[in-house]
């Protein structure tokens, strides 16, 4: 059993009780999400320079942004890879990332990159409990939340 499954009380990745009956699908984590963007170069610059992600090229010339054990695949508006969302559009995402540094350092870095802080720091509730967050926008206007867990 995976550590996350054990922590969440999940039986196994397929949700089986004894291996005989599948009663539900149990998901373990997010592998990747897709952002549809207007300008892939501006997006890569923002996410690497401001948020510290790593540019990844895969499957020929496809682009992604890696961080932690996750990635964001990038699709250019009007030239999306199949299959894709029913109505892919730039600027429609609202994403929250956990920072690997104290929030004050993250805020100082974002400001040093001449990116406006839209709100924060403010208390919020994350997937595993209380967080402290601040908000900014990427080049397409997606709302980006950067957070630290609160003790």
Residue ranges and their predicted role:
Residues 118-126:
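Short, basic/aromatic recognition patches
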Residues 121, 130-133:
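Low-complexity, intrinsically disordered Gly/Pro/Thr-rich segments
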Residues 1-4, 8-31, 35-57, 67-119, ...:
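Glyoxalase I/VOC metalloenzyme domain signal
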């Amino acid at each position: 059993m995976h550590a996350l499954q054990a922590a969440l009380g999940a039986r196994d990745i397929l949700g089986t009780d004894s291996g005989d009956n599948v009663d539900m699908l149990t998901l373990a984590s997010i592998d990747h999400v897709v952002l549809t963007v207007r300008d892939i170069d501006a997006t890569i610059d923002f996410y690497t320079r401001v948020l510290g992600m790593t540019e990844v090229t895969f499957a020929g010339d496809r682009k992604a942004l890696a961080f932690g054990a996750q990635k964001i695949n990038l699709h250019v508006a009007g030239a999306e890879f199949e299959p894709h969302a029913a109505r892919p559009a730039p600027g429609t995402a609202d994403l929250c990332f956990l920072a690997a540094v104290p929030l004050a350092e993250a805020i100082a870095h974002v400001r040093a990159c001449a990116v406006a802080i839209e709100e924060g720091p403010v208390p919020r509730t994350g997937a595993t409990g209380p967080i402290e967050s601040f908000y900014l926008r990427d080049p397409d206007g997606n709302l980006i939340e950067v957070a630290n867990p609160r003790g």
